[in-house]
């Protein structure tokens, strides 16, 4: 199984992605969900091997908490924008605070090993423990 679900809240981007999936040799193994992730995520049944979150920052913790439950032991959850141009160090905006809380949550979560990659805007990687 290559992918259980990929999604985008924006219809136009979801349609564009679907065109590429249709041309891909593994396209029949990709399920594209169009709509808010908080509505789509409960439809994905585990276990999953890898997830990559790059969405509305204020819901990162909600996405993470759902995904860690359905990720197989050894599986990865990757969260984009973990450094947020340095704004997580001195948060001002709601998204700054949300990402700072998310980083703390992952760092303190006994269910995962974690690694913060200082690549571009930062990628937090959480590996579910066995």
Predicted regions mapped to residue ranges:
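Short alpha-helical
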Residues: 11-12, 39, 58-59, 121
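Short active-site oxyanion
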Residues: 29, 51, 111-113
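Short SAM/SAH-binding signature in class I
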Residues: 46-53, 76
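Cofactor-binding loops of NAD(P)H-dependent oxidoreductases
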Residues: 35, 53-55
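Single conserved hydrophobic/aromatic residue that forms the stacking wall/gate
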Residues: 1-10
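Structural motif
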Residues: 1, 21-25, 39-43, 69, ...
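C-terminal substrate-binding/active-site "lid" region of AdoMet-derived donor-dependent transferases
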Residues: 59-130
């Amino acid at each position: 199984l290559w992918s259980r679900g990929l999604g985008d809240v924006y219809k136009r981007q979801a349609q564009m992605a679907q065109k590429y999936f249709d041309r891909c040799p593994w396209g029949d193994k990709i399920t594209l969900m169009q709509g808010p992730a908080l509505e789509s995520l409960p439809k994905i049944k585990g276990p999953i091997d890898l997830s990559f979150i790059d969405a509305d920052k204020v819901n990162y913790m909600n996405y993470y908490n759902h995904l860690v439950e359905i990720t197989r032991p050894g599986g990865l959850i990757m969260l984009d924008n973990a450094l947020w141009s340095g704004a997580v160090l001195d948060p001002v905006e709601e998204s700054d605070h949300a990402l700072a809380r998310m980083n703390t949550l992952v760092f303190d979560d006994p269910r995962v090993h974690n690694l913060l990659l200082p690549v571009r805007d930062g990628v937090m990687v959480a590996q579910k423990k066995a």
